[in-house]
Amino acid sequence: MTFRHCVAVDLGASSGRVMLARYDSKHRTLTLREIHRFVNCLQKTDGFDTWDIDSLEKDIRLGLKKVCNEGILIDSIGIDTWGVDYVLLDKQGQRVGLPVSYRDNRTTGIMPQALVQIGKSEIYRRSGIQFLPFNTIYQLRALTKQQPELTAQVAHALLMPDYFSYRLTGEMNWEYTNATTTQLVNINTDDWDDTLLAWTGAKKSWFGRPSHPGNVIGDWICPQGNRIPVVAVASHDTASAVIASPLANKHSAYLSSGTWSLMGFESKKPYTTDEALAANITNEGGAEGRYRVLKNIMGLWLLQRVLKERRITDLPALIAQTEALPACRFLINPNDDRFINPDDMHAEIQAACRETDQPVPVSDAELARCIFDSLALLYADILHELANLRGEKFTQLHIVGGGCQNALLNQLCADACGIRVMAGPVEASTLGNIGIQLMTLDELNNVDDFRQVVSANYDLTTYIPNPDSEIARHVAQFQPKRQTKELCA
Protein backbone atom coordinates (compact mmCIF):
# COMPACT_ATOMS: atom_id res chain seq x y z
CA MET A 1 0.00 0.00 0.00
CA THR A 2 1.43 3.39 -1.00
CA PHE A 3 -0.66 5.66 1.21
CA ARG A 4 -1.49 5.39 4.89
CA HIS A 5 -3.96 7.55 6.77
CA CYS A 6 -3.48 7.80 10.52
CA VAL A 7 -5.39 9.94 13.00
CA ALA A 8 -3.71 11.52 16.00
CA VAL A 9 -5.78 12.76 18.91
CA ASP A 10 -3.53 15.23 20.74
CA LEU A 11 -4.87 16.67 23.99
CA GLY A 12 -3.09 19.43 25.86
CA ALA A 13 -3.97 21.11 29.12
CA SER A 14 -5.54 24.05 27.27
CA SER A 15 -6.71 22.65 23.92
CA GLY A 16 -7.18 19.49 21.92
CA ARG A 17 -7.15 18.59 18.25
CA VAL A 18 -7.81 15.70 15.94
CA MET A 19 -5.22 15.58 13.17
CA LEU A 20 -5.12 13.49 9.99
CA ALA A 21 -1.76 12.33 8.66
CA ARG A 22 -1.17 11.10 5.12
CA TYR A 23 2.01 9.10 4.58
CA ASP A 24 3.32 8.17 1.14
CA SER A 25 5.57 5.18 1.78
CA LYS A 26 7.03 5.25 -1.73
CA HIS A 27 8.28 8.84 -1.53
CA ARG A 28 8.42 9.02 2.31
CA THR A 29 6.36 12.19 2.40
CA LEU A 30 4.26 13.01 5.44
CA THR A 31 1.57 15.68 5.66
CA LEU A 32 -0.73 16.74 8.49
CA ARG A 33 -4.17 18.29 8.32
CA GLU A 34 -6.17 19.61 11.24
CA ILE A 35 -9.66 18.11 11.28
CA HIS A 36 -11.08 19.41 14.53
CA ARG A 37 -9.81 21.72 17.28
CA PHE A 38 -11.47 22.31 20.63
CA VAL A 39 -10.93 24.00 23.97
CA ASN A 40 -9.90 22.17 27.12
CA CYS A 41 -10.29 24.12 30.33
CA LEU A 42 -10.76 23.58 34.03
CA GLN A 43 -14.13 23.73 35.73
CA LYS A 44 -15.07 23.86 39.40
CA THR A 45 -16.95 20.79 40.63
CA ASP A 46 -17.73 20.36 44.33
CA GLY A 47 -14.79 22.61 45.17
CA PHE A 48 -12.27 20.78 42.96
CA ASP A 49 -10.63 21.90 39.72
CA THR A 50 -11.79 19.18 37.31
CA TRP A 51 -11.65 18.30 33.63
CA ASP A 52 -14.83 18.18 31.55
CA ILE A 53 -14.07 14.64 30.45
CA ASP A 54 -17.41 14.05 28.71
CA SER A 55 -17.01 17.16 26.58
CA LEU A 56 -13.50 16.06 25.60
CA GLU A 57 -14.75 12.63 24.58
CA LYS A 58 -17.55 14.21 22.57
CA ASP A 59 -15.04 16.35 20.66
CA ILE A 60 -12.74 13.38 20.03
CA ARG A 61 -15.61 11.37 18.56
CA LEU A 62 -16.73 14.37 16.51
CA GLY A 63 -13.25 14.74 15.02
CA LEU A 64 -13.05 11.04 14.17
CA LYS A 65 -16.49 11.12 12.54
CA LYS A 66 -15.45 14.13 10.45
CA VAL A 67 -12.58 12.08 9.01
CA CYS A 68 -14.82 9.11 8.29
CA ASN A 69 -17.44 11.32 6.68
CA GLU A 70 -14.82 12.47 4.16
CA GLY A 71 -14.71 8.89 2.91
CA ILE A 72 -11.14 8.37 4.10
CA LEU A 73 -10.19 4.85 5.15
CA ILE A 74 -8.35 5.30 8.43
CA ASP A 75 -5.54 2.82 9.04
CA SER A 76 -5.12 3.54 12.75
CA ILE A 77 -5.79 5.96 15.61
CA GLY A 78 -3.51 7.09 18.45
CA ILE A 79 -4.14 9.27 21.51
CA ASP A 80 -1.68 11.33 23.54
CA THR A 81 -2.36 13.73 26.43
CA TRP A 82 -0.64 15.49 29.30
CA GLY A 83 0.61 13.33 32.17
CA VAL A 84 -0.19 12.52 35.83
CA ASP A 85 -4.00 12.92 35.74
CA TYR A 86 -6.33 9.91 35.79
CA VAL A 87 -9.94 8.74 35.61
CA LEU A 88 -11.54 6.40 38.14
CA LEU A 89 -13.89 3.56 37.13
CA ASP A 90 -16.15 1.23 39.10
CA LYS A 91 -16.61 -2.54 38.66
CA GLN A 92 -18.95 -1.97 35.73
CA GLY A 93 -16.35 0.19 33.98
CA GLN A 94 -18.36 3.35 34.59
CA ARG A 95 -16.70 6.60 35.57
CA VAL A 96 -16.57 7.47 39.28
CA GLY A 97 -16.69 11.24 39.66
CA LEU A 98 -14.85 13.71 37.44
CA PRO A 99 -11.06 13.62 37.01
CA VAL A 100 -9.39 16.23 39.21
CA SER A 101 -6.73 18.38 37.58
CA TYR A 102 -3.12 18.35 38.68
CA ARG A 103 -3.50 22.12 39.23
CA ASP A 104 -6.02 21.57 42.03
CA ASN A 105 -4.70 22.38 45.49
CA ARG A 106 -5.81 19.10 47.11
CA THR A 107 -2.21 17.85 47.08
CA THR A 108 -0.92 20.75 49.18
CA GLY A 109 1.25 19.31 51.95
CA ILE A 110 1.05 15.73 50.66
CA MET A 111 4.53 15.44 49.13
CA PRO A 112 6.31 16.41 52.38
CA GLN A 113 4.50 13.50 54.08
CA ALA A 114 6.00 11.08 51.57
CA LEU A 115 9.48 12.51 52.03
CA VAL A 116 9.23 11.83 55.78
CA GLN A 117 7.39 8.50 55.69
CA ILE A 118 9.19 6.85 52.76
CA GLY A 119 12.23 9.06 52.26
CA LYS A 120 13.19 11.23 49.32
CA SER A 121 16.17 9.13 48.25
CA GLU A 122 14.13 5.92 48.53
CA ILE A 123 11.33 7.28 46.33
CA TYR A 124 13.88 8.44 43.77
CA ARG A 125 15.79 5.15 43.88
CA ARG A 126 12.59 3.28 43.10
CA SER A 127 11.03 5.60 40.51
CA GLY A 128 13.78 7.85 39.10
CA ILE A 129 11.11 10.54 38.73
CA GLN A 130 11.36 14.19 39.75
CA PHE A 131 9.47 15.50 42.74
CA LEU A 132 6.47 17.54 41.65
CA PRO A 133 3.71 18.23 44.18
CA PHE A 134 1.01 17.12 41.73
CA ASN A 135 2.51 13.78 40.67
CA THR A 136 -0.06 10.98 40.61
CA ILE A 137 1.44 9.40 43.72
CA TYR A 138 0.42 12.47 45.75
CA GLN A 139 -2.91 12.84 43.96
CA LEU A 140 -3.87 9.27 44.88
CA ARG A 141 -2.83 9.81 48.49
CA ALA A 142 -5.03 12.91 48.59
CA LEU A 143 -7.91 10.94 47.06
CA THR A 144 -7.79 8.02 49.49
CA LYS A 145 -7.36 10.21 52.57
CA GLN A 146 -9.81 12.97 51.66
CA GLN A 147 -12.53 11.03 49.81
CA PRO A 148 -12.80 7.52 51.32
CA GLU A 149 -16.42 7.06 50.19
CA LEU A 150 -15.47 7.77 46.58
CA THR A 151 -12.39 5.56 46.90
CA ALA A 152 -14.55 2.64 48.02
CA GLN A 153 -16.33 2.64 44.64
CA VAL A 154 -13.13 2.38 42.58
CA ALA A 155 -12.15 -0.78 40.70
CA HIS A 156 -9.84 0.71 38.04
CA ALA A 157 -7.74 3.83 37.50
CA LEU A 158 -6.82 4.81 33.95
CA LEU A 159 -4.51 7.63 32.94
CA MET A 160 -6.10 10.17 30.61
CA PRO A 161 -5.07 8.77 27.19
CA ASP A 162 -5.80 5.22 28.33
CA TYR A 163 -9.29 6.29 29.40
CA PHE A 164 -10.11 7.72 25.98
CA SER A 165 -8.72 4.59 24.28
CA TYR A 166 -10.92 2.53 26.60
CA ARG A 167 -13.96 4.58 25.66
CA LEU A 168 -13.28 3.96 21.97
CA THR A 169 -12.40 0.27 22.20
CA GLY A 170 -13.79 -1.11 25.45
CA GLU A 171 -10.29 -2.39 26.28
CA MET A 172 -8.17 -1.18 29.19
CA ASN A 173 -4.49 -0.38 28.77
CA TRP A 174 -1.81 1.29 30.86
CA GLU A 175 0.76 2.78 28.48
CA TYR A 176 4.33 2.88 29.79
CA THR A 177 5.60 6.38 28.90
CA ASN A 178 2.65 8.05 30.58
CA ALA A 179 2.65 5.61 33.49
CA THR A 180 6.19 6.67 34.39
CA THR A 181 5.02 10.26 35.02
CA THR A 182 3.00 9.00 38.00
CA GLN A 183 6.17 8.42 40.10
CA LEU A 184 4.70 4.99 40.84
CA VAL A 185 6.51 2.84 38.26
CA ASN A 186 9.65 1.05 39.42
CA ILE A 187 12.54 2.10 37.21
CA ASN A 188 14.11 -1.37 37.36
CA THR A 189 11.04 -3.51 36.64
CA ASP A 190 8.89 -1.15 34.49
CA ASP A 191 5.97 -2.27 36.66
CA TRP A 192 4.06 -0.55 39.46
CA ASP A 193 6.13 -0.28 42.61
CA ASP A 194 4.43 -2.08 45.51
CA THR A 195 5.90 0.14 48.24
CA LEU A 196 5.03 3.43 46.56
CA LEU A 197 1.57 2.28 45.53
CA ALA A 198 0.80 0.97 49.03
CA TRP A 199 1.67 4.37 50.51
CA THR A 200 -0.99 6.06 48.36
CA GLY A 201 -3.76 3.86 49.74
CA ALA A 202 -4.74 2.83 46.22
CA LYS A 203 -5.08 -0.87 45.40
CA LYS A 204 -2.69 -2.50 42.96
CA SER A 205 -5.71 -4.21 41.39
CA TRP A 206 -6.73 -0.81 40.01
CA PHE A 207 -3.86 -1.04 37.54
CA GLY A 208 -2.65 -3.45 34.88
CA ARG A 209 1.01 -3.90 34.01
CA PRO A 210 2.28 -0.97 31.90
CA SER A 211 2.74 -1.80 28.22
CA HIS A 212 5.31 -0.22 25.96
CA PRO A 213 4.13 1.84 22.97
CA GLY A 214 3.38 0.07 19.71
CA ASN A 215 0.69 -2.46 20.61
CA VAL A 216 -2.89 -2.40 19.32
CA ILE A 217 -5.31 -1.84 22.21
CA GLY A 218 -8.47 -2.70 20.31
CA ASP A 219 -10.73 -1.44 17.54
CA TRP A 220 -12.98 1.58 17.19
CA ILE A 221 -16.00 0.94 15.00
CA CYS A 222 -16.59 3.99 12.83
CA PRO A 223 -20.09 5.14 11.77
CA GLN A 224 -19.64 3.34 8.44
CA GLY A 225 -19.00 0.06 10.29
CA ASN A 226 -15.25 -0.29 9.64
CA ARG A 227 -13.08 -1.56 12.49
CA ILE A 228 -10.11 0.78 12.99
CA PRO A 229 -7.22 -0.26 15.27
CA VAL A 230 -6.41 2.06 18.17
CA VAL A 231 -2.66 1.99 18.80
CA ALA A 232 -1.00 2.59 22.15
CA VAL A 233 1.35 5.36 21.05
CA ALA A 234 3.84 7.08 23.35
CA SER A 235 0.81 8.56 25.05
CA HIS A 236 2.52 11.16 27.21
CA ASP A 237 2.55 14.16 24.87
CA THR A 238 6.18 14.97 25.67
CA ALA A 239 7.22 11.41 24.88
CA SER A 240 5.57 11.80 21.49
CA ALA A 241 7.19 15.22 20.99
CA VAL A 242 10.65 13.79 21.67
CA ILE A 243 10.07 11.03 19.11
CA ALA A 244 9.48 13.75 16.49
CA SER A 245 12.47 15.85 17.58
CA PRO A 246 15.08 15.50 14.81
CA LEU A 247 17.98 15.12 17.24
CA ALA A 248 21.20 15.16 15.24
CA ASN A 249 23.42 13.24 17.67
CA LYS A 250 24.14 12.61 21.33
CA HIS A 251 25.22 16.23 21.75
CA SER A 252 21.69 17.46 21.00
CA ALA A 253 19.26 18.45 23.74
CA TYR A 254 15.55 19.08 23.29
CA LEU A 255 13.06 21.57 24.65
CA SER A 256 9.38 20.76 24.22
CA SER A 257 7.85 24.21 24.52
CA GLY A 258 4.20 24.76 25.31
CA THR A 259 2.10 25.24 28.43
CA TRP A 260 4.97 23.38 30.05
CA SER A 261 8.56 23.51 28.88
CA LEU A 262 10.41 20.23 29.22
CA MET A 263 14.15 20.31 28.65
CA GLY A 264 16.30 17.22 28.47
CA PHE A 265 18.20 14.67 26.46
CA GLU A 266 17.64 11.13 25.27
CA SER A 267 19.55 8.34 26.97
CA LYS A 268 19.79 4.57 26.92
CA LYS A 269 20.28 4.59 30.69
CA PRO A 270 18.57 6.40 33.57
CA TYR A 271 20.41 8.87 35.79
CA THR A 272 19.53 8.24 39.44
CA THR A 273 22.70 9.43 41.16
CA ASP A 274 22.76 11.72 44.19
CA GLU A 275 23.64 14.53 41.79
CA ALA A 276 20.55 13.79 39.69
CA LEU A 277 18.39 13.72 42.82
CA ALA A 278 19.83 17.03 44.03
CA ALA A 279 19.03 18.60 40.64
CA ASN A 280 15.55 17.01 40.66
CA ILE A 281 16.12 15.37 37.28
CA THR A 282 13.47 12.99 36.00
CA ASN A 283 13.90 9.78 34.00
CA GLU A 284 10.61 9.39 32.17
CA GLY A 285 10.00 6.48 29.86
CA GLY A 286 10.44 6.85 26.13
CA ALA A 287 10.02 4.71 23.05
CA GLU A 288 12.29 1.75 22.29
CA GLY A 289 13.55 1.50 25.85
CA ARG A 290 15.05 4.98 25.83
CA TYR A 291 14.80 7.38 28.75
CA ARG A 292 13.80 11.02 28.60
CA VAL A 293 16.22 12.56 31.08
CA LEU A 294 14.68 15.97 31.64
CA LYS A 295 13.40 18.68 33.91
CA ASN A 296 10.00 20.38 33.99
CA ILE A 297 9.78 24.14 33.58
CA MET A 298 6.54 26.06 34.06
CA GLY A 299 6.79 27.32 30.48
CA LEU A 300 4.29 29.43 28.61
CA TRP A 301 1.60 28.80 31.21
CA LEU A 302 2.59 32.13 32.77
CA LEU A 303 2.08 33.95 29.47
CA GLN A 304 -1.18 32.11 28.74
CA ARG A 305 -2.60 33.26 32.06
CA VAL A 306 -1.48 36.87 31.53
CA LEU A 307 -3.03 36.89 28.05
CA LYS A 308 -6.32 35.61 29.44
CA GLU A 309 -6.43 37.91 32.46
CA ARG A 310 -5.58 41.03 30.49
CA ARG A 311 -7.69 40.02 27.47
CA ILE A 312 -4.79 40.21 25.04
CA THR A 313 -5.70 38.76 21.64
CA ASP A 314 -2.93 40.05 19.34
CA LEU A 315 0.10 38.01 20.40
CA PRO A 316 2.36 39.00 17.45
CA ALA A 317 1.81 42.68 18.27
CA LEU A 318 2.60 42.04 21.93
CA ILE A 319 5.83 40.21 21.03
CA ALA A 320 6.87 43.10 18.76
CA GLN A 321 6.34 45.56 21.62
CA THR A 322 8.19 43.24 23.98
CA GLU A 323 11.21 42.97 21.69
CA ALA A 324 11.62 46.76 21.76
CA LEU A 325 12.08 46.78 25.54
CA PRO A 326 15.47 46.43 27.27
CA ALA A 327 16.28 42.94 28.51
CA CYS A 328 16.52 41.64 32.06
CA ARG A 329 14.93 44.53 33.96
CA PHE A 330 12.40 42.19 35.58
CA LEU A 331 13.39 38.62 36.49
CA ILE A 332 11.52 35.88 38.30
CA ASN A 333 11.94 32.15 38.76
CA PRO A 334 9.23 30.65 36.52
CA ASN A 335 9.49 27.42 38.53
CA ASP A 336 8.53 29.09 41.79
CA ASP A 337 5.50 27.13 42.97
CA ARG A 338 3.62 30.40 43.52
CA PHE A 339 3.00 30.36 39.76
CA ILE A 340 1.33 26.92 39.58
CA ASN A 341 -2.21 28.31 39.67
CA PRO A 342 -2.46 31.75 41.31
CA ASP A 343 -5.73 33.66 41.37
CA ASP A 344 -4.09 36.52 39.46
CA MET A 345 -0.94 35.64 37.49
CA HIS A 346 0.15 39.15 36.54
CA ALA A 347 -0.28 40.33 40.14
CA GLU A 348 1.78 37.34 41.32
CA ILE A 349 4.57 38.21 38.87
CA GLN A 350 4.51 41.82 40.04
CA ALA A 351 4.64 40.72 43.68
CA ALA A 352 7.62 38.45 42.99
CA CYS A 353 9.54 41.35 41.43
CA ARG A 354 8.58 43.68 44.27
CA GLU A 355 9.69 41.18 46.91
CA THR A 356 13.12 40.86 45.28
CA ASP A 357 13.65 44.65 45.10
CA GLN A 358 13.34 44.88 41.33
CA PRO A 359 11.39 47.26 39.13
CA VAL A 360 7.79 46.08 38.79
CA PRO A 361 6.45 45.26 35.30
CA VAL A 362 3.23 47.16 34.64
CA SER A 363 2.40 47.12 30.93
CA ASP A 364 1.48 44.02 28.95
CA ALA A 365 4.81 44.17 27.12
CA GLU A 366 6.77 44.48 30.36
CA LEU A 367 5.04 41.42 31.80
CA ALA A 368 5.79 39.45 28.62
CA ARG A 369 9.41 40.64 28.69
CA CYS A 370 9.71 39.46 32.28
CA ILE A 371 8.37 36.03 31.34
CA PHE A 372 10.52 35.60 28.21
CA ASP A 373 13.78 36.76 29.82
CA SER A 374 13.18 34.66 32.91
CA LEU A 375 12.37 31.54 30.90
CA ALA A 376 15.46 31.92 28.71
CA LEU A 377 17.73 32.32 31.73
CA LEU A 378 16.13 29.33 33.45
CA TYR A 379 16.62 27.29 30.26
CA ALA A 380 20.33 28.14 30.40
CA ASP A 381 20.51 27.21 34.07
CA ILE A 382 18.89 23.83 33.50
CA LEU A 383 20.87 23.05 30.35
CA HIS A 384 24.02 23.61 32.41
CA GLU A 385 22.69 21.20 35.06
CA LEU A 386 21.96 18.56 32.45
CA ALA A 387 25.40 18.92 30.86
CA ASN A 388 27.08 18.54 34.24
CA LEU A 389 24.99 15.47 34.98
CA ARG A 390 26.10 13.58 31.88
CA GLY A 391 29.62 15.02 31.81
CA GLU A 392 29.38 16.41 28.27
CA LYS A 393 28.35 19.77 26.89
CA PHE A 394 25.55 20.13 24.38
CA THR A 395 26.21 21.73 21.01
CA GLN A 396 22.63 22.09 19.80
CA LEU A 397 19.16 22.56 21.25
CA HIS A 398 16.01 21.49 19.39
CA ILE A 399 12.89 23.43 20.35
CA VAL A 400 9.66 21.72 19.33
CA GLY A 401 5.98 22.31 19.99
CA GLY A 402 3.81 25.40 19.82
CA GLY A 403 6.33 27.55 21.68
CA CYS A 404 8.89 27.14 18.90
CA GLN A 405 6.90 29.69 16.87
CA ASN A 406 8.01 32.44 19.25
CA ALA A 407 11.08 33.80 17.44
CA LEU A 408 11.95 36.23 20.22
CA LEU A 409 12.00 33.54 22.89
CA ASN A 410 13.97 31.21 20.60
CA GLN A 411 16.67 33.85 20.08
CA LEU A 412 16.77 34.69 23.79
CA CYS A 413 17.18 30.97 24.47
CA ALA A 414 20.07 30.69 21.99
CA ASP A 415 21.76 33.76 23.49
CA ALA A 416 21.34 32.62 27.09
CA CYS A 417 22.32 28.99 26.46
CA GLY A 418 25.18 29.94 24.16
CA ILE A 419 24.43 27.22 21.61
CA ARG A 420 22.69 26.91 18.26
CA VAL A 421 18.94 26.49 18.47
CA MET A 422 16.90 24.62 15.87
CA ALA A 423 13.17 25.41 16.06
CA GLY A 424 10.55 22.99 14.74
CA PRO A 425 8.46 21.08 14.10
CA VAL A 426 5.51 22.85 15.69
CA GLU A 427 3.25 19.78 15.73
CA ALA A 428 5.81 17.57 17.43
CA SER A 429 3.43 15.70 19.75
CA THR A 430 1.08 14.92 16.88
CA LEU A 431 3.93 13.81 14.65
CA GLY A 432 5.41 11.54 17.32
CA ASN A 433 1.98 10.03 17.83
CA ILE A 434 1.79 9.34 14.09
CA GLY A 435 5.33 7.97 14.07
CA ILE A 436 4.51 5.14 16.48
CA GLN A 437 1.38 4.33 14.46
CA LEU A 438 3.43 4.06 11.25
CA MET A 439 5.94 1.79 13.00
CA THR A 440 3.09 -0.38 14.27
CA LEU A 441 1.78 -0.57 10.68
CA ASP A 442 5.30 -1.69 9.59
CA GLU A 443 5.79 1.40 7.44
CA LEU A 444 8.87 2.57 9.37
CA ASN A 445 11.68 0.69 11.06
CA ASN A 446 12.24 2.65 14.26
CA VAL A 447 12.38 6.10 15.86
CA ASP A 448 15.57 7.09 14.06
CA ASP A 449 14.00 6.17 10.73
CA PHE A 450 10.98 8.32 11.57
CA ARG A 451 13.19 11.27 12.51
CA GLN A 452 14.67 11.15 9.03
CA VAL A 453 11.15 11.46 7.64
CA VAL A 454 10.47 14.44 9.90
CA SER A 455 13.71 16.16 8.86
CA ALA A 456 12.91 15.65 5.18
CA ASN A 457 9.35 16.97 5.44
CA TYR A 458 9.48 19.83 7.94
CA ASP A 459 11.61 22.96 7.76
CA LEU A 460 13.58 24.02 10.82
CA THR A 461 14.60 27.58 11.70
CA THR A 462 18.12 28.16 13.01
CA TYR A 463 19.02 30.68 15.72
CA ILE A 464 22.69 31.53 16.26
CA PRO A 465 23.70 32.71 19.75
CA ASN A 466 24.93 36.27 20.23
CA PRO A 467 27.49 36.23 23.06
CA ASP A 468 27.35 40.03 23.32
CA SER A 469 23.60 40.17 23.96
CA GLU A 470 22.26 41.66 27.16
CA ILE A 471 20.75 38.39 28.28
CA ALA A 472 24.00 36.48 27.73
CA ARG A 473 25.68 38.85 30.17
CA HIS A 474 23.05 38.07 32.81
CA VAL A 475 23.43 34.29 32.75
CA ALA A 476 26.07 34.11 35.49
CA GLN A 477 24.02 36.42 37.74
CA PHE A 478 20.74 34.52 37.42
CA GLN A 479 20.32 32.20 40.39
CA PRO A 480 16.66 31.20 40.38
CA LYS A 481 16.71 29.11 43.53
CA ARG A 482 18.20 31.66 45.89
CA GLN A 483 15.06 33.59 46.80
CA THR A 484 12.19 31.34 45.75
CA LYS A 485 10.51 28.08 46.64
CA GLU A 486 11.12 25.85 43.64
CA LEU A 487 8.20 23.99 42.15
CA CYS A 488 10.42 20.94 41.80
CA ALA A 489 12.32 21.21 45.09
Swiss-Prot record:
Positions annotated as active site in the UniProt record: 237 (proton acceptor)
Necessary cofactors: Mg(2+)
GO biological process: glycerol metabolic process; rhamnose catabolic process
Keywords tagged on the record: ATP-binding, Disulfide bond, Kinase, Magnesium, Nucleotide-binding, Rhamnose metabolism, Transferase
GO cellular component terms listed in the entry, alphabetical order: cytosol
Molecular function GO terms recorded: ATP binding; glycerol kinase activity; rhamnulokinase activity
Disulfide bonds: 68-222, 353-370, 413-417
Enzyme Commission number(s): 2.7.1.5
Known role: Involved in the catabolism of L-rhamnose (6-deoxy-L-mannose). Catalyzes the transfer of the gamma-phosphate group from ATP to the 1-hydroxyl group of L-rhamnulose to yield L-rhamnulose 1-phosphate.
Catalytic activity: L-rhamnulose + ATP = L-rhamnulose 1-phosphate + ADP + H(+)
Positions with a binding annotation for substrate: 83, 236-238, 296
Positions bound to ATP: 13-17, 259, 304, 402
Gene: rhaB
Pathway annotation: Carbohydrate degradation; L-rhamnose degradation; glycerone phosphate from L-rhamnose: step 2/3
Similarity-based family: Belongs to the rhamnulokinase family.
Name listed for the protein in its UniProt record: Rhamnulokinase
A Pfam family per the record: FGGY_N
